[in-house]
Amino acid sequence: VYSRIQGKTWWMTEHLFNDGENSDDSSKWEFLKWQYSLNHLGKEIRMCMEGYCSAYIYWYLKRFYGLMGDTDKRSPTSEGEITKNGYIMAHYAQYATETTRIKVVTNNEEVCATAYLDEKTGEVTIVLLNLNGASQWLEIPLAGIKKASAVETNETKNMEVIDTGLMESAEGITVLLSANSITSVRLTFK
């Protein structure tokens, strides 16, 4: 499908990620679970970005299945507070906006990645989804990195700063990805 739209502007709107919402039994509200958010919204946005999507539009900003909580009893957060879907979207909104998508490859089927170049600053950001139920060390072998920073969202963290380390060869960095997480790593080369 990507070859048919190459060179064209295209965009995607979210659809309802609200499985189980009609049940009176809150244990069936799948949309409240972190794993559900990561495997649905997280993967969908990543696939759109991988396909050079021009924009991903999320219509329902303030709704129990949206980016911010509302007064609905099914809301995972208090009214006006950011939901897990909101934090997933924030990784792309904060780290991919006004950048150029560049190619990135992982050698691990359970870690998905998209990368972005800020042509003004030369910074590169990699947004990583660890779809594994276990933490994983990741090496980013790029020469010339002067500074690296990372933030992560998982079941218990929301855009929290995490450590990065220099590889022994000094030709890249390492980062520990939590189980079932989305992590944004920003690399500075100047």
Ranges and model annotations:
Residues 2-7:
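Acidic (Asp/Glu)-rich catalytic clusters
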Residues 11-91, 102-111:
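Aromatic/acidic polysaccharide-binding cleft in carbohydrate-active enzymes
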